[in-house]
């Protein structure tokens, strides 16, 4: 599988706009200079459990299979303690995927593959650099008020918009890897925390949301 096979048009359009932002190259250079990736890896090793052939070998086997199918370099895989079901991928040069313990407890084996496949999709589509910059800007904004003062506001806003669109491409990747039925089952659990066998109802709800999202009132309130 190649990135061009799964990248959503909205994702491609948004990332093209980001690359045209004045000052982006300087922001990237600043990011790389301060070595935020090393900080992330240190926090992972100190506060999470790394998944490998000895720790959670079945999960690691499934993870390796997905990585091979996509033909990407194997990132590090970690589990962190949180009851909330979540996963994320950061690190351009030292890439890692982190899964919450809530995911491990609530999703079955195939559904976990769907989540991991989604995160691997971000890697395949080369989203990780920009996602890492986004989270770094968010942390810097809270610490130093940079975002609130407007220093990086144009870049931050564009990255936020693109980040939402990038999820469409990652979802495509997950769906291709595990199939639509498993993918939809995982989404239902992520949304409600409960198992749902009513796939048709989920699809109808998704269509209803899409119609609502396109409404002029909704667009005037929030852009997604």
Where are the regions a protein language model picked out?
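Active-site His/Glu-centered metal-binding helix of metallohydrolases
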Residues: 107, 116-125, 169, 173
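Catalytic Zn2+-binding segment of zinc metalloproteases
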Residues: 120-139, 145
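Short, hinge-like loop/turn segments at secondary-structure boundaries
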Residues: 93-95, 140
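Active-site-proximal gating segments in proteases and membrane effectors
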Residues: 23, 80-89, 93, 177-224
